[in-house]
Every structure is written in C-alpha cells, then in structure tokens.
A protein has these predicted regions:
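Terminal-region recognition feature
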Residues: 1-212
Length: 212
C-alpha cells in the first residue's frame, strides 16, 4: 500500500495519555471490562479471508449478551468491509444485540468503513491507535476502439462506475461522522490527502465514545 511506510512510522509514535472521557448513554464504566476480552478478533487485510474468519467467530459467539469486535487493519477491500458491516446491522436490527467496536493500533481505510457500521456510542479505540480515512481510488484504462456509438457507451459506463463509487463513498463518510463534531464537508475535504486521526483526537471529535 502507498501509505505502508508512513503507517509503520506512525505505529512507533508514543502519545501522552489522555484524560478519561465521560461515558455516553447505555454504557457505564462497569461494562468497560468487556472490551478487555473481545469475542471476535480480526487482524490483517480486509479481504475474503477476513470475512470468512469474521463469520466463523460470529457464529461461535454466545446467543445472548453484548458482542465485542476488535479490529486491526491497514485497509483492504471496501466491499468486504461493507458486507461485514451489513451483517452487524442485521444482527442489531433483528436480534437486538448490542455490538461494540474496538479499534486497536490501526484502523485504516476499509477498517474505517467497517467502523462506520457502529453508532458513535459503541465505538472504542485503544490508546495510541490511529484512524485513517481516505477517498476510494480507481485505476482503469479505457480503450476506445470501434463504432462511435459503442465508444460513447464505453465512456458513459466508466463514468457511471465512478459516479456510483462516489455515492457509496459519501454514504460511508456520512455514517462515520454521524452524531460527531465532524462535519461531512470537512471529512470530504480532508479525505483526498489521507486523514490520520489519533485515538484521543477521535474521541475529542466525537468519532468514538472513548479511548481505553
């Protein structure tokens, strides 16, 4: 990944401990110990292998009670992240399960897409963790060869693909900043240059509930 070397450098940075923040509605300090032993632990690229691992661990979770999902990733396939997020949404809506997100060390790119599936009141980060949010990228070569009408159709198809990807991206951006102090336009402005956010800053901006 283009940002891999920068990521390694960031991991070595040691930040000053931040003061504890108040706990939001539905969560109390006595429930924080749940985060020390996540039911689901995911680490590595967000891909089909992670999704298979995610499903296996999710199926093995207790049938009742809160579920904690810990994630460490430098990114991956955003569509896999959206699929995992949809599984969380369905479990929450149909079974009424409380599912908490715990980001550890790095929650980059597709990892932030997955985090967006959780409301702010259910998002946590460990100390010194970084979020990284950026725009989707595309690499595509269009070959114009054939009757003019077919060439126009090929160009339009490529344009529609880009426009649809932007719509999906903006849906994710809105979900990430919902109920936070970050404005959608601010995120959209910072995303093209890869926005790195330290855990304490993410908490202060209301992007996560707390840092543990």
């Amino acid at each position: 990944m283009a940002f891999y070397e920068q990521s390694v450098a960031i991991f070595r940075t040691v930040a000053e401990p931040a003061p504890a923040s108040p706990v939001g509605a539905g969560m109390t300090a006595t429930r924080y110990p749940l985060l020390a032993n996540p039911h689901i632990r995911l680490s590595g690229p967000v891909d089909q292998l992670m999704y298979t691992n995610f499903r296996q661990q999710l199926d093995a979770c207790p049938e009742e009670g809160t579920i904690v999902i810990a994630l460490t990733t430098l990114g991956g396939d955003p569509e896999v992240a959206r699929t995992m997020a949809d599984d969380i949404r369905l479990l929450d809506e149909h079974d009424g399960r409380e599912i908490l997100f715990l980001g550890k060390v790095a929650v980059y790119s597709a990892g932030a897409t997955f985090m967006a599936a959780f409301p702010v009141g259910r998002r946590f980060l460990t100390r010194h963790t970084r979020l990284m949010i950026h725009e989707r990228k595309i690499s595509k070569t269009i070959t114009l060869d054939g009757p003019l009408r077919m060439v126009v159709a090929s160009i339009k198809a490529a344009l529609h693909e880009v426009e649809h990807s932007i719509e999906i991206e903006e849906e994710g951006f809105r979900a990430i900043v919902k109920d936070s102090q970050v404005d959608f336009e601010e995120l959209r402005e910072k995303a093209p240059s890869n926005w790195y956010i330290e855990a304490e800053q993410a908490r202060d901006l209301g992007l996560v509930l707390d840092v543990i």
